[in-house]
């Protein structure tokens, strides 16, 4: 069974202040006509010492954004550029969110509280700086399901409905508004480095690399890696390790992020910033989540390619500090690291003991073929074959029989017909109950089911590239 997050005292540590002058802009939060608490993450609030906040104080901090004690005195809208569908855009940054606070958890990790829908900033362009309530509900569902499936993801920390009528082209409008707070392991994006390259800010690039190496400590590069002692080279090796593992975790989860732009890539390797995400209704490498992704650039099967491409853009930015050869050597590790992560995470979700990369890769290929042939959803597939049970009469079944189970499936949870899933029809039903009847019980019931799934899957593999 999976252990619960470890509680900690409140330990403020706004380290971002050391680089705040050139990485962000102080901004005020929006003033909202209403503050109705819809979700507070009482599972993760203890990890940063905020579990004991009464609801009125919670709303004061996460709806009105009164500063937390000894933390950032004013929110910080972060500056960055980014490739959006591989077209470079220098006119972006935190357009409807900001960094609100930083604190340490029980293990000493620096965690951020950042927002979505908290008002206009210097980077809002034509946007209103707001978030729809439906978007907030979708983010709760995505982060909870990804966490259950072992993905290193941001956590939805708070959702407060704010009483405004919003107009959106991709939702029936007017629609309800909300402000969301996420708990995450940093908000430094690949696009943060791209901005410094575009502005030729070499000293700031050096400082940012040092900040990231200190704040998000990872592994040393391999002993034979060229220039392995250089900070920029070390950082790229670590980010490659993290994003290769992230790509594998999405694939094993059957998850399609939808918008893998460089401004959506956190150098800590944490999955975040959820928009038009979907879960696979069946194993299909061509499946896309975003209705506007007409070319399938960020299709399910192209997600590893997209993350490698994004690592390449980080390498381009780091050319301001390092030679090309050692950076290419770091990028060349992505493929093998991804294959290793796939084997590690695939066997974990099946609840079986790994047999080595070659055998595990053959099992994965046979499993993919089996799912495609049967038109089977990954959630149902992993549930049906957990610990090697019910092996099919095909190549996958033959290979699966040789694996030793590492988990138990004796509990009533594993005897039900199907596992908790997150297909779009159910997401829409959950939202419809809220939208039409202000009925939040389907959401709460779904979250309970998801958390039970996480407990029964047990502790996932540790994210790679982080100490």
Model-derived features: positions:
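Regulatory N- and C-terminal appendages and interdomain linkers associated
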Residues: 1-80, 289, 294-467
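Short, contiguous strand/loop micro-motifs
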Residues: 28-30, 128-130, 233-234
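ATP-dependent phospho-/nucleotidyl transfer catalytic cores
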Residues: 136, 166-257, 268-353
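Conserved ATP-binding subdomain of kinase catalytic cores across diverse folds
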Residues: 34-37, 43-54, 62-224, 268-270, ...
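Hydrophobic HxD+1 residue recognition
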Residues: 259-265
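Short, functional N-terminal and low-complexity linear motifs
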Residues: 7-14, 25-28, 108-113, 174-180, ...
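Active-site-adjacent bridging/hinge elements
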Residues: 14-20, 111-122, 209-213, 282-292, ...
């Amino acid at each position: 069974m999976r252990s619960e997050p470890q509680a900690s005292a409140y330990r403020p540590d706004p380290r971002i202040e050391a680089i705040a002058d050139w990485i962000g802009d102080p901004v005020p939060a929006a003033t909202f006509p209403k503050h109705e608490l819809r979700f507070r993450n009482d599972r993760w609030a203890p990890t940063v010492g905020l579990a004991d906040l009464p609801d009125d104080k919670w709303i004061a901090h996460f709806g009105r954004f009164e500063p937390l004690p000894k933390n950032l005195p004013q929110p910080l809208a972060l500056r960055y550029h980014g490739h959006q569908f591989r077209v470079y855009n220098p006119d972006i940054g935190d357009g409807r969110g900001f960094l609100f606070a930083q604190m340490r958890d029980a293990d000493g990790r620096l965690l951020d509280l950042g927002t979505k829908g908290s008002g206009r900033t210097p980077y809002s362009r034509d946007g209103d700086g707001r978030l729809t309530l439906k978007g907030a509900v979708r983010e709760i569902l995505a982060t909870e399901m990804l966490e259950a499936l072992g993905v290193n993801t941001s956590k939805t920390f708070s959702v407060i409905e704010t009483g405004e009528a919003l107009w959106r082209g991709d939702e029936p409008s007017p629609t309800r508004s909300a402000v969301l707070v996420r708990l995450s392991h940093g908000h430094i994006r690949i696009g943060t480095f791209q901005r410094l390259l575009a502005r030729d800010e070499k000293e700031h690039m050096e400082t940012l690399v040092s900040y990231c190496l200190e704040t998000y400590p990872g592994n040393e590069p391999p002993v034979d890696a060229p220039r392995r002692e250089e900070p920029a080279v070390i950082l790229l090796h670590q980010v490659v390790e993290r994003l290769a593992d992230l790509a594998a975790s999405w694939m094993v989860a059957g998850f399609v992020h939808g918008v893998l732009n460089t401004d959506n890539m956190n150098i800590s390797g944490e999955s975040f910033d959820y928009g038009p995400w979907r879960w696979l209704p069946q194993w299909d490498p061509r499946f896309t989540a975003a209705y506007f992704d007409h070319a399938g650039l960020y299709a399910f099967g192209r997600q590893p390619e997209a993350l490698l491409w994004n690592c390449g853009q980080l390498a381009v930015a780091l050319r301001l500090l390092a030679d090309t050869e050692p950076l290419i050597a770091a990028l060349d590790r992505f493929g093998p690291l991804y294959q290793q992560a796939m084997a590690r995470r695939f066997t974990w979700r099946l609840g079986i003991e790994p047999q080595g990369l070659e055998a595990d890769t053959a099992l994965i290929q046979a499993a993919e073929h089996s799912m495609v042939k049967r038109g089977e959803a990954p959630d149902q597939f992993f549930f049906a074959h957990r610990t090697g049970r019910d092996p099919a009469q095909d190549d996958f079944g033959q290979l699966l029989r040789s694996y030793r189970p590492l988990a138990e499936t004796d509990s009533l949870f594993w005897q039900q017909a199907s596992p908790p899933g997150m297909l779009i029809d159910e997401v829409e039903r959950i939202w419809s109950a809220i939208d039409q009847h202000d009925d939040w019980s389907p959401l709460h019931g779904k979250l309970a089911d998801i958390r039970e799934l996480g407990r029964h899957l047990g502790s996932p593999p540790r994210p790679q590239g982080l100490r």
